[in-house]
Amino acid sequence: MKKIYFLSLFLCVLCIMSGCSKDDDNGGGQGSGDGRVTTDEIYYANQFAYDVLDTYYLWKDEIAAEMQKLDPNVNEDPIGTVKDIRFKENNKEVDKWTMMTDDMESLINNMDGVATTYGYNLMLGKFSNSENYFFIVAFVYEGSPAYKVGIKRGDIIMQLNGKEITKDNYQEALYSSNITLGMGEQKDGYIGLSGQTLTLDAVTMYENPILVHKTFDVGGKKVGYLAYSSFDLDSAEKLVDICCQFKQEGISELILDLRYNGGGYVFTENVLAFMLAPENVVKSKAVYETEIWNKDLMEYYKKKGEDLNTYFSTVVTNGSKTIDVGRANVGITKIYGLIGSGTASASESVLIGLMPYMAVELIGGQSHGKYLSLIHISEPTRRTPI
């Protein structure tokens, strides 16, 4: 059976719309003709990767020489080569995200919030007086194995399967099929074992990214709070319901907790942004984002007269799904964005895209700094902006 290869490419700014197909399927990156050592599958994967990078990659000119490593006659590791040739500047990796995979099902499930998981999000810490580690639970997905045994935010994990946590076994907390956790507790400024153990079996489940939503009365005004962990497609309509509720409750400000949100689909990003923007901005169809592609594609779009702006709107569509967000415009005057190193991509985009039009105050540490979006391309060619 021939594997289907799937290539994720990142492009400057944060919204992908239409594109062009490449007329010359022969591509480049051909070998010297001294002899072919690759299988048909690997030959195709190299050629596919070269053609896609040569058409869509933002830094295609900067990595033109490196792309020759995707010689289909001799390169036996196209997946590794794509990672190796990603754009760098002064030997520092600028593009940390472009990747190629032959496991499309797992990648799509991950984007759609489906995972084989224990259902917790963990932060790793290290003891100052030893080489051992510990975990602190950041949050737990409702209905997950971790949720069912009572694990909650702030809990401490000190052992995995009866052993201290080290650099050699810490990944078992995430990537095993079952595990026994030795729980910890804090006493007198120190962390130690509590004596409690919990055993979990991983399950395949949808991880609902809407972690918490509630309204507080603060000094005579109503303030909403939304903790959100991923801009997946299934949560878009749920966000509309939540914003309708916030509107009904009369909130004037919103605490938007994106500390653990690494991004997701542009479609869902737009749904949320267009409901949080001032109503007059939405009705005036002001510019929300502008796409920047590589030089060749920018010239192509210019010749076609394509508009590369995304405008605020009361309707959000991605071609297959349309959501009316006009009724859910919350009417808030300020957003407090809770951010950290796990805040990336669509999360950063929402906050930055709203800043010209309303008060947005950022609270927390530095965000991840992923100022790019991506398209997914597979065979047969299918592009999904996220």
Regions from the language model: what does each represent?
Residues W59-L70, L258, K283-E291, V325-A328, ...:
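Surface-exposed patches in mature extracellular/periplasmic domains of secreted proteins
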Residues M1-I4:
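Positively charged n-region of N-terminal signal peptides that target proteins for export
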Residues I16-G19:
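C-terminal motif of bacterial Sec signal peptides marking the signal peptidase cleavage site
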Residues G342-A344, Y357-Y371:
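Short, well-structured beta-strand/strand-turn elements
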Residues S21-L254, G262, T268, P278-V281, ...:
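Flexible, low-complexity junctional segments that flank or bridge functional domains
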Residues H376-I386:
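Single conserved hydrophobic/aromatic residue that forms the stacking wall/gate
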Residues V266-K334, H376:
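Gly/Ser/Thr-rich loop/hinge elements
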Residues F6-L11:
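Sec-dependent N-terminal signal peptides
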